[in-house]
Amino acid sequence: FNGNIVNASLLIAAQLEKADIRTAESLGKWNELSLVQQAMVDVGVVQSGYNDPAAALIITDLLDRIAAPTREEIDDALSGLFSRDAGWQQYYQVIELAVARKNNPQATIDIAPTFRDDLEVIGKHYPKTDAAKMVQAKPCYVEDRVTADACVIKMLRSPHAHALITHLNVSKAEALPGVVHVITHLNCPVIY
């Protein structure tokens, strides 16, 4: 936001008018990852589409300001990022790889040891199949793929923790627009 890293949920729409805003979608070209986003995928730090786009923005901003940041500068830049899916070492590797690729786009670094030559994926450094979508903040979760004609389950719980049900009339619920099926204790399939 106007050259500063800001948590988007702390802004209101009126503040955004005529502002310079960079989002994860603005980092790369159409269907192409930016240098930092690609380094994140290659290192294997991408685990969640929630924090990773923010991390890509923060690291891009850091590398725009400081060509080869120290660990202290990296720690300071990432201090506002709460990530439980990855360790800091991987972010240091992302920055090391991105800095190296500024001069040599084919540069690689030792990321992690590999094990078991007889296996192709297990014990190998292998990026997540949806990592590129995640780091670009593109739809990649089941919730992102809900079709317009999908059924949504709604649960109505009893206000009583323990109760003996003697009668249950679901006719009003069944008459509601859009209701496909009402399941109760009387017609619930036994699956075990």
Which residues does each PLM region occupy?
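Signature of N-terminal electron-transfer/Fe-S-associated modules in redox systems
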Residues: F1-A112, V121
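Flexible, low-hydrophobicity surface segments
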Residues: V99-Y192
